[in-house]
């Protein structure tokens, strides 16, 4: 019994109306094919084409946005310009100026280590030195 109903439905042809029925009754609304959004928009077509080409070539879509790539490119260019300017400045200096700069750098390096050692000293030693200074100042004031 159930199989007979299925056979009858198969004979009907499903939900779609056959073309001869559409032509026979002019009051029926003829179905229209839906527009593909990729084909409808020019920008979608170009984007889709570009993605397909990149996929075929094996190129992945960049994970970085365009703005970030531009900023990195500018930073890279700025660093290159800066290095070129430094090299040009070194080339333009005469040997006498270069020797003066070397000596100045050596003197700066010799002065820096004592400052660093003071910074690494424990806190109680710094406080003790401050207390000694205060004590010597007060004793000098008493003498005067």
From Swiss-Prot:
Which GO biological-process labels does this protein carry?
actin filament bundle assembly; actin filament polymerization; regulation of actin cytoskeleton organization
**Which keywords annotate this record?**
Actin-binding, Cell cycle, Cell junction, Cell membrane, Cell projection, Coiled coil, Cytoplasm, Cytoskeleton, Growth regulation, Membrane, Nucleus, Stress response, Synapse
Provide the coiled-coil residue spans.
67-94
Name the Gene Ontology molecular function terms of this record. actin binding
Motif Nuclear localization signal, per the record, lies over 74-84
A GO cellular component annotation here is: neuron projection
Keyword Cell membrane appears in the UniProt entry:
yes
Transmembrane intervals: none
> Cross-referenced Pfam families, in alphabetical order?
DUF1151 (PF06625)
Q: Does the keyword ATP-binding apply?
A: no
What does the UniProt entry say about where the protein is found?
Nucleus; Cytoplasm, Cytoskeleton, Stress fiber; Cell junction, Focal adhesion; Cell projection, Ruffle membrane
Q: Which PANTHER family match?
A: ACTIN-ASSOCIATED PROTEIN FAM107A, DOWN REGULATED IN RENAL CARCINOMA 1/TU3A
* Complex and partners: Interacts with ACTB. Interacts with COMMD1; this interaction stabilizes COMMD1 in the nucleus. Interacts with MAP1A. Interacts with PRDX1. Interacts with F-actin.
- Family of this protein: Belongs to the FAM107 family.
Relate the protein's function as given in its record: Stress-inducible actin-binding protein that plays a role in synaptic and cognitive functions by modulating actin filamentous (F-actin) dynamics. Mediates polymerization of globular actin to F-actin. Also binds to, stabilizes and bundles F-actin. Involved in synaptic function by regulating neurite outgrowth in an actin-dependent manner and for the acquisition of hippocampus-dependent cognitive function, such as learning and long-term memory.
Q: What's this protein's name?
A: Actin-associated protein FAM107A
Q: Which organism is it from?
A: Pongo abelii (Sumatran orangutan)
């Amino acid at each position: 019994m159930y199989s007979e109903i299925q056979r009858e439905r198969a004979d009907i042809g499903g939900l779609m109306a056959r073309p001869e029925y559409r032509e026979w009754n002019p009051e029926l609304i003829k179905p229209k094919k839906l527009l593909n959004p990729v084909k409808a928009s020019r920008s979608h077509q170009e984007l889709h084409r570009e993605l397909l080409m990149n996929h075929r070539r094996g190129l992945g879509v960049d994970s970085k946005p365009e703005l970030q790539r531009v900023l990195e490119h500018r930073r890279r260019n700025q660093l290159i310009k800066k290095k070129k300017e430094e090299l040009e400045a070194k080339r333009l200096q005469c040997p006498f100026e270069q020797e003066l700069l070397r000596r100045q750098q050596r003197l700066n390096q010799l002065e820096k280590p004592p400052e660093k050692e003071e910074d690494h000293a424990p806190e109680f030693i710094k406080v003790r030195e401050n207390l000694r200074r205060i004590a010597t100042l007060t004793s000098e004031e008493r003498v005067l």
